[in-house]
């Protein structure tokens, strides 16, 4: 097979993390209020090596009116990639017993979520059938940083009866290093494009002069009649053709940060010793979710952000547990 060597692009990736942390706890009273403080600091250093066996493209041939084929070198080329990052993650929690029944909590800290492992794989993969409008290159990146969130929470809890309580909480999360996977147009030396090259333009002009519509099929037939194709109907690019513009899909960290904030409400009530009770909770959330269809610049609004609520009635007594739950979520 002149177009596929039989060796697919293969990549391996690892994550090696070294970390150290310190943590401390204090219990004390301030003006008859019992206070608990938990504080900590964690440092992590992560290395991301990746080895890829990559098929290297030579050229893109036009083999039929609607079919284009990427020609690759025989065998594969081994490529090594290495990424590295470090993070400092502080944490500070405070719990205050305001009364015997009311508890206040405050929390501030940073947390991370690592990039999906598939995004970290090194190497570059060209589509094997790059039709016009579908010329895609997929790349990973070992340089991706993890999502980093700064979290702020404040809540009050009222335990007004045994197994019964009500609570309200405020939260705010500011997340940076969001990953963008939108494609960008790039060219690569040596990969020339028959489409819109001099011979293509020649075919379009000749067909239009004869009153024939310049469809891909008619242009391909012109190429064959003009001797631009070999005996098998394969048209190869030449140095006069422009470089192909590939849609390169490569994950990248965004420079801006996104914010999510909201309020959480919850209540649970039990009816004495009967075993019957109910619970309800709601989360009202807002964030950077706006998208302007008239703005031509690239936009990256948060997705999946919505209000939600749950309601449950239950019976729990003498080893028997029965629950009926209703869940609701708004549009997003």
Stretches with model-predicted labels:
Residues 1, 169, 176-181:
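Outer-membrane beta-barrel proteins and related beta-barrel translocases across Gram-negative bacteria
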Residues 1-101, 115, 119, 125, ...:
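Signature of Gram-negative outer-membrane beta-barrel scaffolds
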Residues 172-174, 190-332:
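Gram-negative outer-membrane beta-barrel transporters
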Residues 13, 83, 112-175, 195-208, ...:
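Outer-membrane beta-barrel signature, preferentially recognizing the C-terminal barrel domain
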Residues 18-28, 35-43, 90-98, 102-110, ...:
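Membrane-embedded beta-strands that build the outer-membrane beta-barrel scaffold
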Residues 49-56, 117-123, 130-132, 179-185, ...:
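Outer-membrane beta-barrel translocator domains and adjoining extracellular loop/strand segments
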Residues 44-50, 103, 112-116, 175-177, ...:
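Flexible loop/turn segments at secondary-structure boundaries
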Residues 53-56, 68-74, 125-127, 135-139, ...:
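Short C-terminal domain-edge/linker segments immediately following a structured domain
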């Amino acid at each position: 097979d002149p177009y596929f060597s039989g060796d697919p692009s293969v990549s391996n990736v690892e994550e090696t993390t070294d970390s150290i942390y310190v943590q401390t706890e204090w219990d004390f009273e301030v003006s008859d209020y019992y206070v608990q403080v938990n504080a900590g600091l964690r440092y992590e250093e992560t290395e991301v090596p990746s080895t890829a066996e990559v098929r290297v493209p030579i050229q893109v041939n036009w083999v039929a009116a609607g079919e284009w084929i990427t020609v690759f070198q025989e065998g594969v080329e081994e490529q090594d990639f290495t990424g590295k990052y470090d993070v400092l993650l502080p944490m500070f929690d405070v719990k205050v017993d305001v009364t015997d029944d009311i508890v206040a909590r405050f929390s501030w800290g940073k947390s991370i979520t690592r990039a999906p492992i598939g995004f970290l794989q090194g190497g570059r993969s060209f589509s094997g059938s790059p039709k016009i409008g579908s010329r895609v290159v997929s790349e990973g990146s070992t340089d991706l940083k993890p999502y980093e969130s700064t979290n702020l929470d404040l809540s009050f809890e009222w335990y007004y009866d045994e197994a019964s309580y009500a609570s309200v909480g405020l939260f705010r999360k500011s997340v940076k290093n969001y990953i963008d996977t939108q494609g960008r147009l790039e060219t690569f030396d040596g990969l020339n494009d028959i489409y819109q090259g001099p011979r293509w333009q020649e075919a379009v002009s000749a067909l239009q002069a004869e009153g024939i519509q310049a469809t891909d099929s008619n242009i391909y037939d012109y190429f064959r009649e003009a001797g631009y194709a070999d005996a098998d109907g394969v048209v190869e690019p030449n140095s006069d053709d422009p470089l192909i513009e590939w849609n390169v899909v490569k994950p990248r960290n965004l420079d801006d940060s996104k914010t999510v904030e909201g309020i959480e409400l919850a209540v649970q009530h039990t009816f004495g010793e009967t075993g019957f009770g109910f619970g309800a909770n709601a989360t009202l959330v807002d964030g950077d979710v706006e998208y302007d269809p008239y703005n031509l610049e690239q936009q990256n609004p948060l997705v999946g952000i919505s209000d939600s609520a749950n309601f449950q009635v239950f019976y729990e007594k003498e080893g028997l547990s029965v629950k009926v739950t209703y869940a609701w979520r708004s549009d997003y």
